[in-house]
Amino acid sequence: MSETTLNAAEQPIDELVSWVKQHDFSLNLTTERLAFLIAIAVLSNERFDEELGEGELHDAFTIVTRLFEETGEASAFRANNAINELVKQRLISRFTSEMTEGASIYRLSPLAIGITDYYVRHREFSKLRLSIQLSMVAGEMAKAIEAAKQGGTAGHWKKNVYAVLKYSVGEIFDQIDLNQRVMDEQQQSVKQQIADLLNKDWREAINNCESLLSETSNTLKELQDTLQAAGDELQTQILDIQELVYGDEELEFIEETLFGLQMKLDRITSWGQQAIDLWIGYDRHVHKFIRTAIDMDKNRIFSTRLRQSVKDYFDMPWYLTYADAERLSDLRDEALVLRDDEVTGQVPLEVEYEEFQQVNDELAERIGEMLRLHKDNGKPIDLGIVLKDYLAQHPRTHHFDLARIVIDQAVRMGYSESDYQAIQPDWQAINDYGAKVQANVIDRY
């Protein structure tokens, strides 16, 4: 990005509006014109110098017009009009020189590259692409850290630290952010596909819907794992540079740049979990819709068959056998109140509250004792061990509820220094049934 563009981006809105009006900027791309522009971009990529002659543009226009027969024939007159429209909108640049004997050559403008790049190159957002971009960012950050450790004049900081952070790291972050927005669009596209399938024939569409839902869920999970792993490393690198420039008034511009990068990194890393949470909600909504549709259709089929059977009873007599059983109810409270499988029926609210409060007080006392030992002896608290020892004393059906209470009390009464250093803790088993917890050792009271 040029300094001119940067300065324009920092101007007030009214000045930017005046700038657009002064230069008479405008865009008007019909579907046919957009297809023509994309065709030019594809042909340009196949050329070493990315330049096209007028004849090649006419050929591209002919190819596009074949698929848009309703707009007219692919005449030279219409092709020239289309080319002139793109030139007027500054989507392609026209050059004429003596070397080409007066014939014009054409190149895509930066605006056209941005438009066609979105449609051509950004339609696939994969884990591989994200991994490459994150590796590039980590490499550039390592260069900036090395230059910052060496120190030097203001020119050294601007050239070897500021420039790397502002243009290399910042632009890669912007590219990742753009790709994530493309992924958001892909999710909307998948939702539209699912809606179309369910509207046509939901019975035939169930398997296809499940495939689309699972594929998107797996993709989001892989992307989030990649973001989480790389995000911690990038966070550490940003903190390292901040520590080197902290308190130096001459390097405030470095701190401002790091602050901007921190905001971008937070947005990038939070996107993955947010996308997963939103998709889980949509997944549940689709499954609920399918279950409701199945129930409704099942009842409709049954009533139709019953009416037909009654109508044909004298021709084909039949016996009716039915079974009547009590309806099973799920008594599990959404608030995660402790269950007791030995008791059936509804527990009075006073008993539920008393049982919950008793366990809560007991846990608070146990955690408080551990924290007092830490305070007196400097002994850290391993939350995984505390959970494992405590859960071993209770039935398996209580483990999930108890673990929630233990963690809630622990985070209220202490915290881990490792959390502020962006250190990713390892997973620890907390019972014999596969449950695991990921938590740093509590070492601050």
UniProtKB/Swiss-Prot annotation:
The keyword Transferase does not apply. InterPro entries: Chromosome_partition_MukF (IPR005582), MukF_C (IPR033441), MukF_C_sf (IPR038198), MukF_M (IPR033440), MukF_M_sp (IPR036141), MukF_WHTH (IPR033439), WH-like_DNA-bd_sf (IPR036388), WH_DNA-bd_sf (IPR036390). Disulfide bonds: none annotated. CDD domains: MukF_C (cd16337), MukF_N (cd16335). The keyword Transport does not apply. GO terms for molecular function: calcium ion binding. Residues 213-241 are annotated as: Leucine-zipper. Keywords: Calcium, Cell cycle, Cell division, Chromosome partition, Cytoplasm, DNA condensation. GO terms for biological process: cell division; chromosome condensation; chromosome segregation; DNA replication. Pfam families: KicB (PF03882), MukF_C (PF17193), MukF_M (PF17192). It is found in: Cytoplasm, Nucleoid. GO terms for cellular component: cytoplasm; nucleoid. Interacts, and probably forms a ternary complex, with MukE and MukB via its C-terminal region. The complex formation is stimulated by calcium or magnesium. It is required for an interaction between MukE and MukB. Belongs to the MukF family. Involved in chromosome condensation, segregation and cell cycle progression. May participate in facilitating chromosome segregation by condensation DNA from both sides of a centrally located replisome during cell division. Not required for mini-F plasmid partitioning. Probably acts via its interaction with MukB and MukE. Overexpression results in anucleate cells. It has a calcium binding activity. This is Chromosome partition protein MukF.
